[in-house]
From Swiss-Prot:
UniProt-listed InterPro entries: LNK
Protein name: Protein LNK3
Lineage summary: Eukaryota, Viridiplantae, Streptophyta, Embryophyta, Tracheophyta
Function: Probable transcriptional coactivator.
Disruption phenotype: No effect on circadian clock.
Induction field: Repressed by members of the TOC1/PRR1 family of clock genes.
Keyword list, A-Z: Activator, Transcription, Transcription regulation
Keyword Disulfide bond: no
Keyword Transcription regulation: yes
Native source organism of the sequence: Arabidopsis thaliana
Organism domain of life: Eukaryota
Amino acid sequence: MDCYAEELVVPNYQESSSETYPSTGMWGGWSMSSPEAAEKCFDYDGFNGEGMMYSQMSMRTSEEEEESKRSKAFYGASSLHDFEGIEQMDDMFLSSILEDVPEDDGDVHRATSSNNSVGSSSMYGGGREVPMFHCHDMSFKEEAPFTISDLSEENMLDSNYGDELSSEEFVLQDLQRASQKLTDETRKCFRDTFYRLARSSQDKSDSVSPNSEELLMQTSRYDYGDGNRFSREEEIESETNSIDRAVANLTFNKMESNISNFPLSERVQ
């Protein structure tokens, strides 16, 4: 029969025991599995002859200690295994990301565990080398440098650019550029040539026109009031010569070919 002494529950089989500590066979009575010790569990330390009993309360049972030892052993043994599992999950996540990136030009590669391979890296964890995946930078097509000269060439090659300047302006610019390269004697020669060619073409047109007499009267009337022009026309030969024909051939017959062969970038400055 159990007895109660100062809120201490003592099993009945401990009343006749003279031993200070309970035996190993009686340890089951102190466990949490026994109905007597469902609420409290004590470690019986000693009992003297004068009736003084010393006890020490402990909140840790043998099962808790064993569970603690097992958990420590489990976590100590599986720490590396857990790291490998996390590492495997990271690799799966990174590989799923790499699968979404297009690999048309071979710009995306997986790094190998070799330290000599270019673009690969690794980390050390748990005493072992763990390979990591890397995404190389996507290579883009290099564009040609854009300069101001390219812009000017594009503007000149534009089809709408020819509408801004008329043919007379092009001819005037060409004549100005050509006259700057000629000497004074050459410019005078060209001037006289153009006068003779113009007068020769006018004489031919007057001979064909039915109202040639009226045109001659008008021209003579205009020439009578202009003494400088009349004196200059006297110096000009009335008939064309070989130089005039050469200039006419160079100017009129070869004009289209010369304009097409002449660089457009030099024609407009």
